[in-house]
Amino acid sequence: MGKDIDAEMMMSFDLSPLDWAALLWFLVAWLGYDALSPRVSVAGRSINDSMKKVRFEWMIEMLQREMRMADASLVGHTISSVTFSASTTMIVIAGLVGVLGDIGQAYNVASGLRFAAPMSQSLFESKVLVITGVFVVAFFRFSWSLRQYNYLCALIGAAPSPREKNLHQRAALELAKLMTLAVTSFNQGLRSYYFALCVLVWLAGPGWFALATFGVVLVLLRHHYGSAAARLITEHATKP
């Protein structure tokens, strides 16, 4: 009885072996990139390590200032960006839930697209569920980033004064580490948007889905290691 129910549930998704393979590759690429990117460097160079040093330098400079309004403004601007991203993601999720609520009409529209491969309504619904899941994960990452930025604000408020120089090194390190955690969560949320685009390409078929996932990984790697911004930040962090 239990095996029959499991088989029926698997059939309801209506995914072919190629679809399952492309979906598995997508999950490995998405979650694997998020897990490995903060830890991996290419040719001894990593924008994450460079930015850790830049944030530490920023916090050292901040602790030496009597007036920290500019620093508070910069953090506030970043918090606004995170809040906007979380709000936008909620709107996207609401729209996708609306699609699931009228899946028949949405299926008819999607089937009429020239690039869309033939698919059943169950398969189309599975694809909508996957992209909805991606945006739900993105929302949780943005909201966690926002909470960590709020913790950072509390630490900035409790930071030692310019006269307490013996406490600056440790305080700057703690502030920089917490900021890095908040930024990492925010970056993971942004990357979820990149990978959500891959699921849209899935409408054209599993082969295009797998190819789009590979393309997004290449784009992210170039941004992370090969872009002009990455080189400039690395040069700044490694200068004497």
Regions found by a protein language model. Give the residues of each.
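Juxtamembrane "helix exit" motif at the C-terminal ends of alpha-helical transmembrane segments
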Residues: 10-12, 90-117, 202-210, 216-221
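Short, strongly hydrophobic alpha-helical membrane anchors
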Residues: 1-16
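Membrane-interface amphipathic/juxtamembrane segments adjacent to transmembrane helices
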Residues: 37-78
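Short amphipathic alpha-helical coupling elements at transmembrane boundaries
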Residues: 76, 151-158, 177-184
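Cytosolic/matrix-facing juxtamembrane and C-terminal tails of multi-pass cellular membrane proteins
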Residues: 157-176, 180, 223-240
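Hydrophobic alpha-helical transmembrane segments
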Residues: 13-24, 115-131, 206-211
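Transmembrane alpha-helical segments and their cytosolic interface motifs
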Residues: 71-97, 124, 128, 181-210
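Hydrophobic alpha-helical membrane-embedded segments
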Residues: 19-47, 83-97, 128-150, 194
